[in-house]
Amino acid sequence: MKAVGAWLLCLLLLGLALQGAASRAHQHSMEIRTPDINPAWYAGRGIRPVGRFGRRRAAPGDGPRPGPRRELACIPLEGGAEPSRALLGRLTAQLVQE
């Protein structure tokens, strides 16, 4: 009977300890906000208060498109030489495959 009472007491103390730890974890992240802050004051001085007043988001069509892209590099040939037909054929075949 004493063993059951000891187990219940340990479980009770463990539950209280976990509950206290969980409630303390949220206190440090809370901010005190005052409603008398004017965002126009910051904007007039060249300061962007991003954190409190929200971020400006880009339109969905403005961002980079997903998918692999291959950037073609333009390398000048020395002496004004023309590229060989074989090289042009390989480059054309690579572009057609993509």
Swiss-Prot record:
Keyword Signal appears in the UniProt entry: yes
Coiled-coil stretches noted in the UniProt entry, renumbered to this chain: none
Propeptide feature ranges: 58-98
Signal peptide: 1-22
Gene Ontology BP, a term: autonomic nervous system development
Keywords in alphabetical order: Amidation, Cleavage on pair of basic residues, Hormone, Secreted, Signal
Keyword Nucleotidyltransferase attached: no
Name listed for the protein in its UniProt record: Prolactin-releasing peptide
